[in-house]
């Protein structure tokens, strides 16, 4: 029995990155061997064991053979005669198919180190096409390692295109698509994930609402990049610069999906894209089974991001209605999330990445004024039942009117 460190831990060592988890492969052993040594079996589909002291995962060397459709349609063979090279052969990318023995010697039968040095994400074998999940995983790795200069190797991208065209992606469950997407949205440059999916044709299959935006023009005076799809990825990139909140990043990604449904006869203008976007975002989130907080923010951003751009011109009553709709009184974090998404939209334009966004400070100040109206004071003044909310709204509106009048007076005095 021999054990080898495999996968991400070996890859990250040669990239000089911190190791998150260490996974091990055991060659020349049967389940009974590990159980006798105190390992705890946790794997259902194939034997995975927890080390009795370190609790790290040890898996018996195995091979996989396609036996059905989708990413779960595999039969697994594990026995003492399975070699390390056979186990590594079933892995997705060469940089993930390296191992180290107990003396720290690299075992690299498929050229992973060379691809790592050349910053290439390359498939290990033609069996890559048997698992549709690998399309998403490669796109995610491309986004994760893009800051280090990694790109998808041309032959691997060609296989991903083939898989997208042949309908294999239809076998991916919504939960798995969202899981991979959520991981990508948590990374430093999630826009690369969606760009790679578009390059291989998977975006049209898995995220048609986003894919449809490419080629849809916007007015050049407002959008120097013109293409709404490009603007969408720029907005996602800016949102990722401003916040690590997955909900903010997803809402930035979907903020303009309604522009894919507007009448081409009126392009490059997109009147009514907000309400159209709300319907699409709702359908998209239902299909992907996104968490409710992610869905709710995306719906609000799709409908109201343009209104926030004009917040300095809004009447006090409209401003209060916006704050009520965002539900800032019960969910104050929503205000900052909405502001970040709108700022990402404004700055996610070619050449305008560094422009200020004064609407952010204005909306925060407006909220601060309205929030100073305390419900306890309304109750102390004798209001009861439904009258409490009515009076609260009246006082908040008056606070906004007074504040806005003072703002305008100060501007006129300059």
Curated annotation (Swiss-Prot):
Disulfide topology: none
Binding site for Mg(2+): 21, 23
Pfam family membership, one: PolyA_pol_RNAbd
UniProt cross-references to InterPro entries, sorted A to Z: CCA_bact (IPR012006), HD/PDEase_dom (IPR003607), HD_domain (IPR006674), NT_sf (IPR043519), PolA_pol_head_dom (IPR002646), PolyA_RNA-bd (IPR032828), tRNA_CCA-adding_enzyme (IPR050124)
GO molecular function: ATP binding; CCA tRNA nucleotidyltransferase activity; cyclic-nucleotide phosphodiesterase activity; magnesium ion binding; phosphatase activity; tRNA binding
Biological-process GO terms, alphabetical: RNA repair; tRNA 3'-terminal CCA addition
Chain positions recorded as ATP binding sites: 8, 11, 91, 137, 140
Catalytic reactions of this protein: a tRNA precursor + 2 CTP + ATP = a tRNA with a 3' CCA end + 3 diphosphate; a tRNA with a 3' CCA end + 2 CTP + ATP = a tRNA with a 3' CCACCA end + 3 diphosphate
Record-listed CTP binding positions: 8, 11, 91, 137, 140
EC number of this enzyme: 2.7.7.72, 3.1.3.-, 3.1.4.-
Domain HD as annotated: residue spans: 228-329
Function comment: Catalyzes the addition and repair of the essential 3'-terminal CCA sequence in tRNAs without using a nucleic acid template. Adds these three nucleotides in the order of C, C, and A to the tRNA nucleotide-73, using CTP and ATP as substrates and producing inorganic pyrophosphate. tRNA 3'-terminal CCA addition is required both for tRNA processing and repair. Also involved in tRNA surveillance by mediating tandem CCA addition to generate a CCACCA at the 3' terminus of unstable tRNAs. While stable tRNAs receive only 3'-terminal CCA, unstable tRNAs are marked with CCACCA and rapidly degraded.
Record text about domains: Comprises two domains: an N-terminal domain containing the nucleotidyltransferase activity and a C-terminal HD domain associated with both phosphodiesterase and phosphatase activities.
Miscellaneous section: A single active site specifically recognizes both ATP and CTP and is responsible for their addition.
Entries under HAMAP family matching the protein: CCA_bact_type1 (MF_01261), CCA_bact_type2 (MF_01262)
Assembly and oligomerization: Monomer. Can also form homodimers and oligomers.
Protein name (database record): Multifunctional CCA protein
């Amino acid at each position: 029995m021999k054990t080898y460190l495999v996968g991400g831990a070996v890859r990250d060592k040669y990239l000089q990155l911190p190791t998150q988890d260490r996974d091990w492969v055991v060659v020349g052993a049967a389940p009974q061997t590990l159980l006798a040594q105190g390992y705890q079996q946790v794997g259902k589909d194939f034997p995975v064991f927890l080390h009795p002291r370190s609790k790290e995962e040890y898996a018996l060397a195995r091979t996989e053979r396609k036996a059905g459709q989708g990413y779960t349609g595999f039969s697994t063979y594990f026995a003492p005669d399975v070699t390390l090279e056979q186990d590594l052969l079933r892995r997705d990318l060469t940089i993930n198919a390296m191992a180290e023995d107990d003396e720290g010697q690299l075992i690299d039968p498929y050229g992973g180190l060379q691809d790592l040095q050349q910053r290439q994400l390359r498939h290990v074998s033609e069996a890559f096409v048997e698992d549709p999940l690998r399309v998403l995983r490669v796109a995610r790795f491309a986004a994760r390692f893009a800051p280090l200069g990694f790109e998808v190797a041309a032959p691997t991208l060609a296989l991903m295109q083939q898989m997208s065209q042949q309908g294999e992606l239809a076998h991916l469950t919504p939960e798995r698509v969202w899981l991979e997407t959520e991981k990508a949205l948590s990374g430093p440059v999630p826009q690369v994930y969606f760009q790679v999916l578009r390059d291989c044709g998977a975006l049209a299959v898995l995220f048609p609402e986003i894919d449809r935006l490419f080629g849809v023009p916007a007015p050049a005076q407002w959008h120097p990049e013109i293409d709404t799809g490009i603007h969408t990825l720029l907005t996602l990139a800016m949102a990722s610069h401003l916040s690590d909140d997955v909900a903010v990043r997803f809402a930035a990604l979907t903020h303009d999906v309604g522009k894919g449904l507007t009448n081409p006869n009126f392009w490059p203008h997109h009147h009514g894209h907000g309400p159209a976007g709300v319907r699409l975002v709702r359908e998209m989130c239902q299909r992907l089974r996104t968490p409710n907080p992610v869905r709710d923010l995306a719906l609000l951003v799709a409908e109201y991001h343009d209104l926030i751009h004009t917040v300095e011109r809004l009447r006090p009553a409209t401003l209060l209605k916006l704050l009520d709709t965002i539900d800032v009184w019960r969910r104050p974090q929503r205000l900052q999330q909405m502001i970040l998404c709108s700022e990402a939209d404004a700055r996610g334009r070619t050449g305008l990445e560094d422009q200020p966004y004064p609407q952010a400070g204005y909306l925060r100040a407006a909220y601060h004024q309205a929030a100073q109206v305390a419900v306890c004071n309304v109750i102390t003044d004798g209001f009861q039942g439904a009258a409490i909310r009515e009076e609260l709204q009246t006082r908040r509106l008056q606070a906004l009117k007074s504040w806005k009048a003072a703002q305008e007076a100060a501007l006129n005095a300059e």
